[in-house]
């Protein structure tokens, strides 16, 4: 199975690194998916959720405030200002991550409609975790 190498980096350090089956980014012009052997591109990222599908079929979600992504044939590197992985082993840990993610998004945008949309996506992504 073909995979894509994905890195998500913030000023504080590496948030995610690994092989993935696919990844969906919140691009400035709309969401877009990346699969192995994708055409090269550079895109701005807006506040939203990066959705990752791992080779074993499991899914991970990382909320970001803004940044950019550089995609080449078999690698995608996202440099973002802030990120919160939606993960946890207990409901309280996941609830804490959801609150952190909402605060991150609220600090990145004043557009109330966009905030509501992203917050709904955060809640949906957290249910998958």
UniProtKB/Swiss-Prot annotation:
Record has DNA-binding as a keyword: no
Main location: membrane
GO CC terms of this entry: plasma membrane; proton-transporting ATP synthase complex
InterPro entries: ATP_synth_F1_dsu/esu (IPR001469), ATP_synth_F1_dsu/esu_N (IPR020546), ATPsynth_dsu/esu_N (IPR036771)
Membrane association type: Peripheral membrane protein
Entry-linked Pfam families: ATP-synt_DE_N (PF02823)
Record keywords: ATP synthesis, Cell inner membrane, Cell membrane, CF(1), Hydrogen ion transport, Ion transport, Membrane, Transport
Record flagged with keyword Acyltransferase: no
Example GO molecular function: proton-transporting ATP synthase activity, rotational mechanism
Intracellular or extracellular location(s): Cell inner membrane
SUPFAM superfamilies cross-referenced by the UniProt entry: Epsilon subunit of F1F0-ATP synthase N-terminal domain
Family (UniProt): Belongs to the ATPase epsilon chain family.
Subunit text: F-type ATPases have 2 components, CF(1) - the catalytic core - and CF(0) - the membrane proton channel. CF(1) has five subunits: alpha(3), beta(3), gamma(1), delta(1), epsilon(1). CF(0) has three main subunits: a, b and c.
Function: Produces ATP from ADP in the presence of a proton gradient across the membrane.
Protein name: ATP synthase epsilon chain
Record lineage: Bacteria, Pseudomonadati, Campylobacterota, Epsilonproteobacteria, Nautiliales
């Amino acid at each position: 199975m073909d995979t894509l190498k994905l890195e998500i980096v913030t000023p504080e350090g590496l948030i995610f690194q690994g092989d993935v089956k696919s990844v969906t980014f919140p691009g400035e012009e709309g969401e877009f998916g990346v699969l192995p052997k994708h055409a090269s591109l550079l895109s701005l990222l807006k506040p939203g959720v990066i959705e990752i599908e791992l080779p074993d079929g499991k899914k991970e979600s990382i909320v970001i405030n803004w940044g950019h992504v550089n995609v080449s044939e078999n690698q995608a590197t996202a440099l973002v200002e802030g990120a919160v992985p939606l993960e946890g082993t207990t409901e309280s840990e996941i609830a804490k991550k959801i609150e952190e993610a909402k605060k991150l998004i609220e600090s990145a945008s004043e557009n109330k409609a966009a905030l509501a949309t992203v917050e709904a996506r955060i809640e949906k992504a957290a249910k998958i975790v």
